[in-house]
Amino acid sequence: ERRELIRRTWGQERSYGGRPVRRLFLLGTPAPEDAERAEQLAERAALEAREHGDVLQWAFTDTFLNLTLKHVHLLDWLEARCPRASFLLSGDDDVFVHTANVLRFLETKSPDRHLFAGQLMSGSLPIRESWSKYFVPPQLFSGSVYPVYCSGGGF
């Protein structure tokens, strides 16, 4: 499983140069295509949360279209639970992060100033094929080209 691999590699919780690093996994509820396994997946997520203490789960369907909602919940949680946190790195579970390099980069930045770093994307087109996980219906975004944005794997 990807989360376990992250826990054992780059996502180990430890202190880097006296700075504690916390790892969290964000989950919603199983998507409709996982309905027949929903109960099993929920039990596994609850067990994992108890065992590792690093799983946050909210009551919304965990789909690509709800990714913004997932991040809004994370920011609310962070403000309530980690008010002294200086930086947040959000990334997908299919990326590798060189934690020490990220921290070296952040050491050059002031925690008193806003920072948003990532791969800047421009000229991207919305996917209109309904079978794609990246499908964006025209009712949600009617434009033909997205405004400039930072892309995930990590931002």
PLM region spans:
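Secretory-pathway lumenal glyco-enzymes, predominantly type II signal-anchor Golgi glycosyltransferases
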Residues: E1-F155
